[in-house]
Amino acid sequence: VSPFVLAASAEMLFTDLPLTERVRRLDAAGLEVEIWDWTTKDLPALAATGARFGSMTGYVRGGLVDPGAADELLRTAERSLAAAEVLGCPRLNVHGTGLDARGLPVVPHEVVTAADLLAAARTLERLAALGERHGRVFTLENLNRAVDHPGVPFARAEETLALVAAVDSPHLRLNLDLYHAQIGEGNLVELCLAALPHVGEIQVADVPGRCEPGTGEIHYPRVAAALAGAGYSGVVALEGWAAGDPATALERFREAFTPAVPVGAPGAAP
């Protein structure tokens, strides 16, 4: 049995099926379900599946720095909270700026200044207050610039962690995406341990290719053992494609995050 709450993205698995059927498949596998843009979805139909939804995109447009963009992010976050209510979804995910359908920033922001960081922290304080009023948690996700999201501000986990720690609210947590972090930063075990006090969930996929654990260079069983050894029992979500059969991908994911011996326990490797 995994010590973590396991989840998976319905956006990236069983993609030959309608979304409601993907959700049912993940739920039948005992997983929390995650989705992205809720505005294109039949929310009552998704709710009717009876699945446990864990995370969804928490804004439609906007950004963290420019005052007008920040106001738009807050306005669309309020709409997203209403959607989360329909699904009973506890976590709403945001990024450093609004992304288009290709994952590219609507307004590229290549250089982040100290003033930008301060402005972003103020916006995130407002977002945390909104989450508190509605009894929900917003998560801020790190991305990567090299492969998937060039031009996105606050892409590094180092930056997103600093922002979440500065706001220091139970209603704003870090969505630590280890696929993105491996591309941009590496040193995943130390990153996880440093971030754990502020983590709302951890997302995973292997590098390169963004498929399930075991298809790339990351030794996820070692990461899982470190997390378990540190006492983490929260959400770990597969946000990646299946290299082949999706059911097999889910089994590989589950196996990687069911560590036999936590790091630091008797019999663990040094």
Language-model regions, residue ranges each:
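Hydrophobic anchor at the start of a short beta-strand
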Residues: 6, 33, 53, 138, ...
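Glycine-rich, proline-tolerant flexible connector loops at the mouths of alpha/beta enzymes
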Residues: 34-50, 57-58, 64, 99, ...
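Short, charged, surface-exposed secondary-structure boundary motifs
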Residues: 63-68, 212
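Conserved beta-strand positions in the central sheet of alpha/beta enzyme cores
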Residues: 34-37, 54-57, 93, 139, ...
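Histidine-acidic metal/acid-base catalytic patches
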Residues: 1-29, 39, 88-90, 99-104, ...
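Active-site acidic/histidine proton-transfer and metal-coordination neighborhood
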Residues: 67-173, 183, 266-269
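Residue-level detector of anion-binding/catalytic polar loops
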Residues: 32, 52, 90, 137, ...
